[in-house]
Amino acid sequence: MNFEETEDLYNVYRGILRNNRSFQPGKSTAVEYRMDCPEYADLLKKYPFEKIAGKGTDLQRAIRVLKYLSPKLTHSPWYDGHVDCNALALLDYSLDKSEQGINCLNKAKILEEVCLALGIYARRVRFLPYSPFDFDCHVVTEI
């Protein structure tokens, strides 16, 4: 291992220690999923996600929705968050509108809420960098 590789690895480990200095005190709680939001009925009425998801396991159905949405939503890291962060508003703003890109947080929000509307357990997960010099993060949907 050369000096640059050693220094990079050192910085990653420094970041791990820095980001995990302390833990939130308190007791563990169960994750709760709300699949009964009134807006979900509007979402399924306006967009054909039930037909797109089709039949099969939750994962198979979620993958079909993902494959449908992916080419229809443009990614933009410069999206400023001016649209309400819910699937209905974000789809109205960005679906099939390449000039209206949204960031990963909002793309994950759309997939999460569509899945919940379909009765598929889903949640957003944020990935934070371990390097103390990297301020970028990423958000995905976990099924």
Range-by-range predicted roles:
Residues N2-I102:
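Secondary-structure boundary elements
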Residues T57, N103-K107, F133:
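Short, contiguous, pocket-lining structural segments
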Residues I63, I102-E113:
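A structural signal for well-ordered alpha-helical segments within the folded catalytic domains
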Residues Y68, K72-H75, N106-L111, L118:
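Long, hydrophobic/aromatic-enriched structural stretches that serve as scaffold segments
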Residues Q100-C104, V125-F127:
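Short His-Asn-centered micro-motif
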Residues K109-I143:
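Hydrophobic/aromatic-rich core segments of domains that either
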